[in-house]
């Protein structure tokens, strides 16, 4: 006998709730996001949502860990495993950021974290621990290895990593914040490509 849909898919519920929460957080921000709406979009009751997540902050942490952090991990793992010249690592990293930002509302979630971190400091801690520090750390480690090989000029690897990431984060925030308000559209993959060539001129020996 065929099982009811709710029984067959019970293992998918946390993932579906997180996917719905990601959309609602990106659209409305953390404070304005309502668990009732998240549950409705996920196709579950609010009571069911509470079986998996005790509050909105725990749900946000799960969203970051399940939806965004794996993409960061994929890029950072690729960087760590690459034995290619540093220039190729930079091009891959920046292109990968642009490609994933096109699929996930990274800029919108980052905007939310920035805007609401004073009232909800846990958001900033989660974003720092699961996303920002890992991306910067992996990039800084790649830069340090390239310095040891003589590819990259002397300097603080972590500061170089911030120089590489800064324009991409600004681009993601621009698309999430200013384009919906009438700002000029931004081609993030084109920015990634041009920025890579520009910054490599200053980094490479």
Residues of each region from the PLM?
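Basic, helix-initiating cap at the start of DNA-binding domains
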Residues: 1-44, 51-58
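Amphipathic, non-transmembrane alpha-helical scaffold segments
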Residues: 10, 18, 64, 124-136, ...
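Short coil/turn segments at alpha/beta junctions that flank glycine-rich nucleotide-binding fingerprints
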Residues: 27-31, 82, 149
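Alpha-helical DNA-contacting segments of helix-turn-helix folds
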Residues: 61-67
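Hydrophobic alpha-helical connector segments
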Residues: 62, 76-110, 158-164
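Short secondary-structure transition hinges
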Residues: 73, 99-141, 182-185
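Hydrophobic/aromatic-rich alpha-helical bundle segments in the mid-to-C-terminal region
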Residues: 125, 133, 147-197
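C-terminal alpha-helix
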Residues: 142, 198-205
């Amino acid at each position: 006998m065929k099982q009811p849909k709710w029984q067959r898919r019970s293992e998918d519920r946390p993932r579906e709730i997180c996917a719905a929460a990601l959309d609602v957080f990106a659209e409305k921000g953390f404070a304005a996001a309502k668990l009732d709406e998240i549950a409705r979009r996920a196709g579950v009751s609010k009571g069911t949502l509470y079986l998996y997540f005790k509050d909105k902050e725990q749900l946000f942490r799960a969203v970051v860990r399940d939806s965004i952090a794996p993409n960061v991990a994929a890029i950072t793992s690729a960087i760590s495993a690459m034995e290619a010249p540093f220039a190729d690592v930079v091009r891959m990293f920046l292109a990968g950021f642009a490609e994933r930002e096109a699929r996930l509302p990274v800029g919108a979630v980052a905007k939310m974290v920035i805007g609401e971190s004073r009232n909800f400091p846990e958001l900033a801690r989660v974003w720092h621990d699961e996303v920002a520090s890992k991306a910067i750390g992996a990039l800084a480690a790649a830069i340090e290895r390239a310095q040891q090989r003589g590819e990259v000029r002397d300097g603080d690897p972590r500061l170089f990593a911030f120089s590489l990431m800064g324009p991409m984060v600004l681009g993601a925030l621009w698309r999430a914040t200013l384009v919906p308000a009438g700002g000029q559209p931004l081609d993030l993959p084109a920015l990634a490509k041009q920025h890579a060539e520009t910054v490599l001129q200053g980094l490479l020996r």
